[in-house]
């Protein structure tokens, strides 16, 4: 399992057609990290090998300290990742806290796919697709 490399300063939605939500951070969150909602209604860093934290809800679009508001994307294209995987490859929550990977972690949590933008370079981005209703 290989984790995707993220450059926090470059994380941004790659298209206007996206589902974006706001939340309060339960801990320090970095742009590009996968987040989950805690039972207290705040958001922490998701992790595929910790029961409860595998309930990933999206990717942080900006960093936040504990108690600060931040935005995260539930569904849509996200730039800022180095993606060696093939176009349309499935992406999963990693056993590394906050990371996405090319294979399932301890708990299998699909999070999206590799997508090509419509530019001439066919730039690879993460197409975030976090399913809330059907998870665990």
Task: Explain the meaning of each model-derived region.
Residues 2-136:
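Glycine-anchored, exposed beta-strand/edge motif detector
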């Amino acid at each position: 399992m290989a984790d995707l490399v993220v450059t926090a300063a470059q994380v941004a939605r790659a298209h206007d057609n996206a589902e974006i939500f706001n939340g309060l951070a339960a801990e320090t969150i970095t742009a590009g990290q996968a987040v989950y909602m805690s039972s207290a209604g705040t958001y922490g860093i998701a992790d595929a090998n910790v029961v409860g934290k595998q309930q990933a809800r999206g990717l942080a679009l900006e960093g936040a300290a504990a108690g600060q508001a931040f935005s995260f994307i539930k569904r849509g294209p996200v730039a800022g990742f180095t993606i060696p995987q093939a176009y349309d490859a499935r992406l999963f929550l990693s056993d590394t806290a906050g990371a996405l990977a090319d294979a399932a972690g301890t708990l299998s949590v699909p999070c999206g796919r590799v997508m090509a933008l419509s530019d001439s370079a066919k730039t690879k981005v993460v197409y975030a697709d976090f399913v809330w209703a059907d998870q665990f």
